[in-house]
A protein has these predicted regions:
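Histidine-centered catalytic micro-motifs
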Residues: 184-188, 221-226, 259-266, 440, ...
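Proline-centered loop/turn at the N-terminus of a beta-strand
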Residues: 24-25, 53, 121, 139, ...
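Alpha-helix-loop-beta-strand connector modules within alpha/beta enzyme cores
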Residues: 414-431, 448-458
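Glycine-enriched alpha-helix->loop->beta-strand junction motifs that scaffold or abut catalytic
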Residues: 216, 294-295, 391-393, 431-433, ...
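N-terminal hydrophobic targeting/anchoring segments and the immediately downstream early-domain regions
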Residues: 249-413, 468-489, 493-526, 530-582
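Distinct, well-ordered alpha-helical segments
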Residues: 138, 353-355, 379-383, 406, ...
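N-terminal beta1-alpha1 cap of cysteine-dependent amidohydrolase-like domains
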Residues: 1-125, 134, 141, 145-174, ...
Length: 582
């Protein structure tokens, strides 16, 4: 230290404004020995060298403490250390098990899972890769069979064996090499990465040396110690800091904009007694998941299954009701009960102004819709009834023709919209309710477009050019919709994104970008269909919706365009429709 004058040390900060540029906040888990929480300096020095601000996290297995800590982090490093207690994996201890650290196990497994829920970028180092695996449903071998020496006697800065890297991996993108030299200090290793991770590197004796997210999340685990490998090791820390910076940018963006999902079917699970204020594993949308994914609002629909000829409606639903209208009312009653029980955090919104008010006041919003005009029971007065209940749209039909129009999966009963359906659309226009043609047949779509005096919408519909199923929209339909000022929102139902293989977030982005190419940025958005079989790898539930934003930022969409995609276009149409009310 050159001087012991405090003022001179502060001068660098005091001589400019702001006093410091933003740097991503990177949490590092501490070791625990005796009564000391400790961390070797190489970890935090590499974070600083990579451009991050390190914060050491003590091993405290208290969910309140952990959640509050994670709220301030942009990235997380799970550091090295002793063995995990195998009981966390449901296993008895091997005779070769070394010292375990009970102070760390519960705390770090909780941190890893909760950070995963929040989509926080993570790096696991040595013990840390094993923490990731255990926390996310994988397995760790308690004592590996070594054909290569994995616990070196050489100095920690000295690489002693080779790691072979898969080319389609984050690690390859970091090093641009299929083989790198690493140090090694372990006798345990990941044996099964589980569903959320995939193996991306192995040693020559087939020990797993690195894993990454299998869901396009920013998660990387390495079995070696890059903090000791100077410039070569720094590259991994730079990767994490870069991802943390992107995550920070996405979080800040979500604070400024409104994020609206235009279609979810969570009420389908009401008969199971779901708890919206719990992180309920039975549903994809709840207060926890919306908060983790930085989602402001969703549109919950009363979905009414279309009976086949000879079937009764009551035989197709779990609640004892007289008919479709009473069923829809019951669903809305139950949504109102949920909101009433959680009124500090949740509200029903009926207009764009309500949504923005809820966001300013720190509440999540639910908008109401009807999926299948069967709810009207061939009674035009029920349009007014449901308008008074606060619905914002009616999807005219579902899977099967009804008395309003023909379905994409129908029998061409009316050759499009029926005469009753025409009256329904006109009444919806009069009462300020959006006309939704998701599930509608192609002739029904064009009829509705001609009949409606306000723009129509497709709350959850993807592109037939990319996935040729009748339920998706053709390019001509998209162009016609855009010409009338309407919007079509990409959905996350796997069968509407691809016909073969597993759909993932990249398929959803491809459908969105195709819609943008065809219709323009002013006519697109996202309608997940969560809890109605929507949900794909990378966008599996509401907690993962910030990953959608990260993909948009990665593709250099402007904030203005992201606002439009995240509901701005939809709310423009809603405003037009509601202003037409007369």
């Amino acid at each position: 230290m050159e001087t012991f004058d405090l003022e001179s040390h502060l001068q660098d900060a005091y001589s400019r404004f702001p006093e410091a540029k933003h740097q991503p906040i990177i949490g590092l888990t501490a070791n625990y020995e005796g009564i000391d929480a400790t961390l070797r300096d190489r970890y935090y020095k590499q974070v600083i060298a990579a451009g991050g601000t390190p914060v050491i996290i003590p091993p405290v297995a208290d969910a309140q403490v952990i959640v509050n800590t994670l709220e301030h982090l942009d990235g997380l490093i799970l550091t090295g250390g002793g063995d995990h207690n195998p009981l966390w994996m449901g296993e008895e201890p091997s005779p070769r098990l070394h010292n375990i650290n009970q102070e760390r196990d519960a705390a770090e497994l909780m941190i890893a899972r909760l950070a995963f829920n929040c989509q926080i970028p993570m790096l696991g180092i040595c013990r840390g890769i094993q923490t990731l695996a255990i926390a996310l449903g994988g397995k760790v071998c308690q004592d590996i069979k070594q054909l290569v020496k994995h616990s070196q006697d050489a100095d920690r800065t000295e690489p002693t064996h080779i790691v072979e890297i898969k080319k389609d991996s984050t690690l390859y993108n970091i090093y641009n090499k299929e083989k790198i030299f690493v140090n090694s200090f372990h006798h345990q290793a990941v044996s099964e990465p589980g569903n959320h991770l995939r193996t991306i590197a192995k040693s020559s004796d087939h020990i797993i040396e690195a894993v990454e997210s299998s869901e396009y999340k920013q998660i990387l685990g390495v079995q070696w110690h890059p903090e000791w490998l100077e410039e070569e090791g720094l590259k991994i820390f730079q990767w994490l800091v870069n991802q943390a910076n992107n995550f920070y940018a996405a979080k800040q963006l979500h604070k400024r904009i409104l994020t609206l999902d235009t279609h979810c079917d969570t009420p389908m699970f009401f008969p199971q007694g779901i708890k919206f204020d719990h992180r309920d594993s039975r549903i994809l949308v709840d207060l926890h998941k919306m908060t983790d994914g930085h989602q402001d609002a969703t549109t919950m629909v009363a979905y009414l299954p279309q009976p086949q000829i000879g079937e009764s409606f009551s035989s197709k639903v779990a609640f004892d009701v007289k008919g479709p209208a009473q069923y829809a009312d019951l669903i809305f009653d139950k949504i109102e009960e949920i909101v009433s029980k959680n009124s500090q955090y949740l509200s029903i919104a009926r207009t764009p102004a309500d949504l923005y008010s809820d966001k300013r006041n720190g509440r999540k919003s639910i908008m109401l819709g009807i999926e299948n005009g069967l709810a009207l029971e061939h009674d035009i007065s029920n349009v007014k009834h449901f308008a008074q209940r606060g619905i914002v749209y009616i999807t005219l039909c579902h899977n099967g023709d009804n008395d309003i129009c023909d379905s994409a999966r129908g029998c061409n009963t009316h050759n499009g919209v029926s005469s009753f359906g025409e009256k329904v659309i006109q009444e919806m226009n009069r009462l300020g309710i959006m006309v939704d043609l998701s599930h509608g047949g192609e002739k029904s779509f064009y009829d509705a477009l001609d009949i409606s005096q306000t723009p129509i919408v497709c709350s959850h519909s993807s592109s037939r050019a990319l996935c040729d199923v009748p339920r998706n929209l053709t390019d001509d339909q998209m162009r016609a919709l855009a010409a009338k000022g309407g919007v079509a929102h990409t959905t996350l139902y796997h069968g509407f994104l691809r016909k073969e293989g597993e759909a993932d977030i990249m398929d959803a982005i491809a459908h969105l970008e195709h819609a943008i190419d065809v219709m323009g940025i002013d006519h697109v958005g996202l309608g997940t269909d969560f809890d109605g079989d929507g949900g794909i790898r990378g966008l599996a539930d509401s907690s993962e919706l910030i990953n959608f934003t990260l993909q948009l930022l990665h593709r250099k969409y402007s904030e203005q365009d992201i606002v439009k995609i995240w509901g701005g276009n939809w709310l423009r149409v809603m405003t037009q429709v509601q202003n037409f009310k007369h």
